Amino acid sequence: MRTLLTILAAGSLLAHITEDTSDLLQHVKFQSSNFENILTWDGRPESPPDTVYSVQYKTYGEEEWLEKEGCQRITQKSCNLTMETSNLTELYYARVTATDGAGRSATKMTNRFSSLQHTSIKPPDVTCIPKVRSIQMIVHPTYTPIRAQNGHQLTLENIFQDLLYHLKLRINHTYQMHLEGKQREFEFVGLTPDTEFLGTIMICIPNLFKESTPYMCRVKTLPDRTWTYSFSGAFLFSLGFLVAGLCYLSYRYITKPPPPPSSLNVQHILPFRPLQFIQEHTLIPVFDLSGSGGLAQPVQYSEVKVSNPTEPPGPPPRHSLPEIAYLGQPDLPVLRPSGGPPHQALPVLSYAPQAAPEGRPSSYAPQGALEAKPPSYTPQAVSETQLPSYTPRATPDNWPPSYGMCGEGSGRDSPPVTRSGPKHLGTKGQLQKEVPAGSCSPTGLSLQEVTPLAMEDPQEAKSSHQCLRVHTDSDSDSDTIGQREPGTRSSLKGQLPLLSSVQIEGHPGCLPLQTPSLPCSPTDKGPSPWGLLESLVCPSDEDPVSKTEAESPGLQAPDLESPTELDSLFRGLALTVQWES
């Protein structure tokens, strides 16, 4: 009986001691993340501070415990067993022994541990890059403390072949976008600019049903500044264009020649109106009047326009003035040449227009004749001190209208001109070269042609002027050549005072047209049909030959034997006169 009581007392005492020492160690276990294996434990709160801890480990299937260097009699409550448990295919055990200052000790062992199964995955390392309409996420590789046989440090991708990255993007907790894959770069596109998003990235291991702790990032897309760039580009372009324009204007201002001084502007003080040649025509006579066959040489004339000196330079405006066309009549006049010595060629003359009398009409308008009677113009005699004045009047039916044509001859034979018809002139019908300077037909008009210096041959310096006289059939025997006094100049009288003087370029002087002269015939009692110029004074008429002939007006050429028709000469020609007031 006494022995039984002793055994019960010893067992109760041993149980009490064991219960007291078990409070020295609590929660001994492995904590592994990304294959980093840490052994941790806890002690009781009232344990004395002088308690020390020792760690031992062993592989599953072995009986001997191995001490961990650096984890013997330590006061901290953790020990890193990563290198000792680095084999992913092995199972491990570990135990901890705690000893206090009173000499009491306690030992606890962990459960069986497999790093491949029990390790946890940490959140990945991700960089979020915001853009205007997208967010780019780059996942960095996660390295583990496990090393390969060659010493290279392994990553999670090297250990888990089926590792995936799962990404989520949320907008105000209402809208989500998902991306998943093994690549390390992802981008969410089609986002709203200047908007905040919440991104979540996790590592998933489907075979082990493992997921990492999610990595969360808040990112805001960039504001859309495209319009700002466009506006800036447009502004810079406009600024460059403005600078270029200013540079161009400055260049034009610097290189612009200065305006000429007003003292050089002599347009308002010129005593004449310059003649401007604006159009050039060609007259081609149909038949030769000199008796030889063949077509005549073409004659060129220019249309002359007088510019207003008070107006600025430039083409003066055209007035709506009527155009006068001279057409041939069915009845033809008789051509009566006048003989006389040839004159010398006129030098290049210079003409200046002068003001015409205000009382005279400013335009010439031919008056229509009666239907039964064609018009005929009869010259009237005027005095030297009075300008000629003509009035057209009707003539009897048997008087055909006459044409007057004046040309310039020379000492040589004139160019061949075709005869006007079957009643052509013989030897007497040809134009005589010796025509007095002032001789004209009784009913016609003499116009001495002035040839420019550029068109005149130097060998024609002694050429003379010829006057073709045209008579009607009824007046061919009764009319005579007018007498002129010595010293008077041959003149061309007309009805319309359009030009008072004429100036030709290259001649030093002016040819006035105001000097009145005697009529071509004492029988001039009517207006002249060629009265466009008031008077055309030729200085060359004062040569000795002209003066001698002027003193002897009785010298006349014999009358033509037969009349010559000139209708074919002017057929198809439309002569137009234009003038400006």
Curated annotation (Swiss-Prot):
Domain Fibronectin type-III: 18-115, 141-221
Keywords on record: Cell membrane, Disulfide bond, Glycoprotein, Membrane, Phosphoprotein, Receptor, Repeat, Signal, Transmembrane, Transmembrane helix, Ubl conjugation
PTM (free text): Ubiquitinated.
Residue ranges that the UniProt entry lists as topological domain Extracellular: 16-228
Modified residues (Phosphoserine): S410, S414
Any GO MF annotation of the entry: cytokine receptor activity
Span of the signal peptide: 1-15
CDD domains associated with the record: FN3
Record topological domains on the Cytoplasmic side: 250-581
Span list, region Disordered: 354-493, 539-563
Cystine bridges: C71-C79, C128-C217
Residues linked to a glycan: N80
Source domain of life: Eukaryota
Biological processes per GO annotation: cytokine-mediated signaling pathway
UniProt subcellular location: Cell membrane
Skewed-composition ranges (Polar residues): 378-389, 440-449
InterPro entries, A to Z: FN3_dom, FN3_sf, Ig-like_fold, Interferon/interleukin_rcp_dom, Type-II_Cytokine-TF_Rcpt
Main subcellular location of this protein, as a coarse class: membrane
GO terms for cellular component: plasma membrane
Quaternary structure (record): Heterodimer with IL10RB and with IL20RB. Interacts with FBXW12; the interaction promotes ubiquitination of IL22RA1.
Family per similarity comment: Belongs to the type II cytokine receptor family.
Function according to Swiss-Prot or TrEMBL: Component of the receptor for IL20, IL22 and IL24. Component of IL22 receptor formed by IL22RA1 and IL10RB enabling IL22 signaling via JAK/STAT pathways. IL22 also induces activation of MAPK1/MAPK3 and Akt kinases pathways. Component of one of the receptor for IL20 and IL24 formed by IL22RA1 and IL20RB also signaling through STATs activation. Mediates IL24 antiangiogenic activity as well as IL24 inhibitory effect on endothelial cell tube formation and differentiation.
Official protein name in the record: Interleukin-22 receptor subunit alpha-1
Organism listed in the record: Bos taurus (Bovine)
